[in-house]
């Protein structure tokens, strides 16, 4: 999913309809056909016809303009619903790679309420972390460094949000370093609280899930 300059995915907070809100008019197909494809995709996924939605997303990928994070997100979600873990993680890898290439990747982890550890059902996140560590190593291989930042919604006090977001960023950094020791000196963790909230309603539900994100972006290395 693309948010301005941000490329991100979400399977735990955002509504499925948001994950499927694609701008198909940018594809090299007619506007009428693009509109029809978008409607078919949304209906198939929200109607729980995941085999059909997967086929449609794969057909979009065959178009040169279809190779983008939002489409790979659809492939990821559809495969996950079908219990196809390996194809789902391959799609996640493409999302992570394209986000890193775009210099900013936003990912929604499902943290425990008010805490800096992941929710109990963290089964996809272990695989996410492994892939993110691989892509982070590639992104910093040329001597650049990376900032891992955490963001919160507008509910609660800002000092608390700042502290919580830093704890979450440090948690994600440590998970990455556990996978790739060479990342320890290349990643800095920062917490921004709600200062960069994108929705900023403070509702703490799926409508403002984008506010509670982890971002990966290039940063200057410490001298």
State the predicted function of each range.
Residues 107-114, 132-169, 187-200:
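Short, surface-exposed beta-strand segments enriched in small/polar/acidic residues
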Residues 45, 84, 198, 205-223:
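A cross-taxonomic marker for long C-terminal extensions/tails that follow the last structured domain
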Residues 116-149, 173-179, 216-223:
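Periplasmic peptidoglycan-binding/anchoring modules of Gram-negative envelope and division proteins
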Residues 36-39, 52-55, 70, 87-90, ...:
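Extracytoplasmic/secreted proteins, especially bacterial periplasmic and envelope-associated proteins
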Residues 183-187, 211:
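Short acidic capping loops at alpha-helix termini that bridge into adjacent secondary structure
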Residues 62-65, 80-81, 93, 97, ...:
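Sec-exported extracytoplasmic/periplasmic mature domains
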Residues 80-91, 97-107, 112-132, 197-199:
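Alpha-helical linker/edge segments of TPR/alpha-solenoid repeat scaffolds
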Residues 1, 7-8, 12-104:
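N-terminal targeting leaders that direct proteins to extracytoplasmic destinations
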């Amino acid at each position: 999913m693309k948010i301005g300059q941000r490329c991100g995915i979400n399977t735990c907070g955002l509504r499925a309809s948001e994950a499927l809100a694609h701008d198909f008019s940018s594809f090299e197909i007619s506007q009428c056909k693009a509109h029809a494809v978008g409607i078919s995709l949304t209906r198939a996924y929200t109607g729980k016809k995941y085999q059909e939605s997967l086929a449609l997303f794969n057909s979009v990928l065959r178009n040169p303009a279809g190779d983008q994070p939002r489409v790979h997100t659809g492939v990821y979600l559809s495969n996950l619903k079908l219990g196809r873990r390996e194809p789902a993680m391959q799609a996640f890898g493409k999302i992570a790679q394209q986000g890193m290439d775009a210099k900013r990747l936003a990912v929604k982890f499902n943290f425990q309420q008010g805490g800096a550890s992941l929710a109990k059902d963290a089964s996809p996140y272990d695989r996410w972390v492994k892939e993110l560590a691989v892509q982070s190593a590639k992104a910093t291989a040329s001597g650049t460094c990376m900032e891992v930042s955490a963001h919160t919604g507008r509910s609660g006090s800002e000092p608390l949000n700042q502290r919580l977001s830093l704890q979450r960023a440090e948690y994600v950094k440590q998970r990455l370093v556990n996978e790739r020791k060479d990342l320890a000196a290349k990643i800095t963790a920062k917490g921004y609280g709600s200062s960069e909230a994108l929705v900023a309603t403070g509702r703490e539900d799926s409508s403002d899930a984008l506010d509670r994100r982890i971002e990966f972006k290039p940063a200057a290395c410490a001298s």
